[in-house]
Every structure is written in C-alpha cells, then in structure tokens.
C-alpha cells in the first residue's frame, strides 16, 4: 500500500485494512480501463489486476465528505441494479437518510417530470457504472454529480468520484458501503469520535440469497434427530441413564404399575371360583316367563 497523503487522524486502522483485504476489495478483473490505471498497484502473474487499498480508503473518505456536505440527506440517491448491492444500498439509506433505488432503474426518473417516480437529487451514488449506466446517463443530462464504485474494467464516463474497489463480490460491495456509511456518520457527528465503534455490524450489508435462506430454514425444520441427540435428550429427562443397559431411577414406572395391577386382578378372579353361567341361569323346573315380574293389570 502506498503512503497515504491524509492527516494522521484519517489514517485507516489495521482492522480496516484487514477487513478490506478479507473482503477481497483489492482484487480487480483481468481487464484494465485506462482511467483506472492510477489506482492499480500491480498485476499478478495470472493476469488479475490488484487495486491499491490506500487509494480506495482515500476515495471513501472523499466521498463521505461530499455526502456529509449535503444538508438534506434525502437529496442523496443511492442506486444498485446489481443484486449484490441492493441490500447494501437499502441499509445505507436507512442509516444515513438517503433515498434508495434497489433493483431496476426506471428510465426517466431524473429527466421525465411527468412520471410519479420523478426525482431531483443533488447527488447519486451507484454500485456499478456498467449496470447502472442508465442512471449515470440521465444524471449527466441534468448535471447531477456521480459517485461510483469502480472496478479496474469499469467505464468512468460522467463519473465524478470513482471509488476503486471490487464491485462484483458481495462481501466487497457490502464492506465499502458499510465503511462509507460509518464515515458519513462520523463526519455528521452521529458517532462521537473516530475511536467510537459503530454498533452496526458489517454483516447486515452483505447480500443474502432469499431462496438459500428459505431452504436452510426448511432443512432445519425437517431435520430428523440422530441417535446421539435422542440419547442425550433421554438422559436429561431421566428416562435413560448414561449406561443404556442400566435403567435410570424412575425409568419404566408406568409399565411396572400396569403389570402389578394386572396380576392382582387375575388373582382375585381365580379366587372366586364361581360359575358365571350358574348365577344367571333360572332354577330348574321354571321357565323364563315365570321368573319375569308380572305387570299390574288395570
């Protein structure tokens, strides 16, 4: 990383540099656009261009100062047509008060005042100049400044501030938006000083696949407990001891009580010794009709 030209108080912390490297913000593509050469550190033997992380940090601070200079946060429009950046722009908008356009950008948002979605922002921030080309083109028609996350192969036409970073990985995109939001809050005074940690974790800015999350929940609900889990549950509830050959205290009590009751009933019936048929049969020489009570005649 090249030496920074920033004042010492704005220098990145070792944790910030580790996060940028872990999210692979320094890995560009194999193609290089001529206007992105100043942000290039070197090219690896496999052809991948490596971005200078120091330049990335400097541009994040510059973009944050521009954003903090706008009085009304709602006049800032953050845009991402790329799925990996949609969650990040929504979180950025909720934390800074900006207006988010996540998904398809409707043509005419900045130029056609008849449409309901017409907007007049003072600044727009896009995730990828290639996928958000329509927004940049319309911004150029109405003189709106543009901040963009630019990879080594990104076109920089009509881009006023380019933040050199990997804009194709979900972790890299989420981390840059998170760092940008944190610096904006620091400059606005929401965070007391630069030593104050932001309580929002960077994971909230990462893209999550809805189908993968849904399948994960379904798999957890339909998961069949294994033998180890069943055994552990039985030991905790007291129905089985740690040694399966030896019953725990109280184990099998319902079965023992039922067996004892059955044995007692069988003993009492055998002791009676009487003939059930004899007790219900009429005496000899009498008919069934004679044994029935006679009804009173009126």
UniProtKB/Swiss-Prot annotation:
Q: Which GO terms describe its molecular function?
A: structural constituent of ribosome
Record field: compositional bias (Polar residues):
289-298
- From the Swiss-Prot or TrEMBL record, give the protein name: Small ribosomal subunit protein uS2
Give the quaternary structure: Component of the small ribosomal subunit. Mature ribosomes consist of a small (40S) and a large (60S) subunit. The 40S subunit contains about 33 different proteins and 1 molecule of RNA (18S). The 60S subunit contains about 49 different proteins and 3 molecules of RNA (25S, 5.8S and 5S). Interacts with rps21.
Q: What exactly does this protein do?
A: Required for the assembly and/or stability of the 40S ribosomal subunit. Required for the processing of the 20S rRNA-precursor to mature 18S rRNA in a late step of the maturation of 40S ribosomal subunits.
Stated family:
Belongs to the universal ribosomal protein uS2 family.
Q: What is the lineage of its organism?
A: Eukaryota, Fungi, Dikarya, Ascomycota, Pezizomycotina
Q: Name one GO cellular component term.
A: cytosolic small ribosomal subunit
Q: Which GO biological process annotations does it have?
A: ribosomal small subunit assembly; translation
Q: Where is the composition biased (Low complexity)?
A: 248-271
Tell me yes or no: is Ribonucleoprotein among this UniProt entry's keywords: yes
Q: Where is this region: Disordered?
A: 240-298
Q: Report the Gene3D superfamilies cross-referenced here.
A: Glucose-6-phosphate isomerase like protein, domain 1
Cellular location(s): Cytoplasm
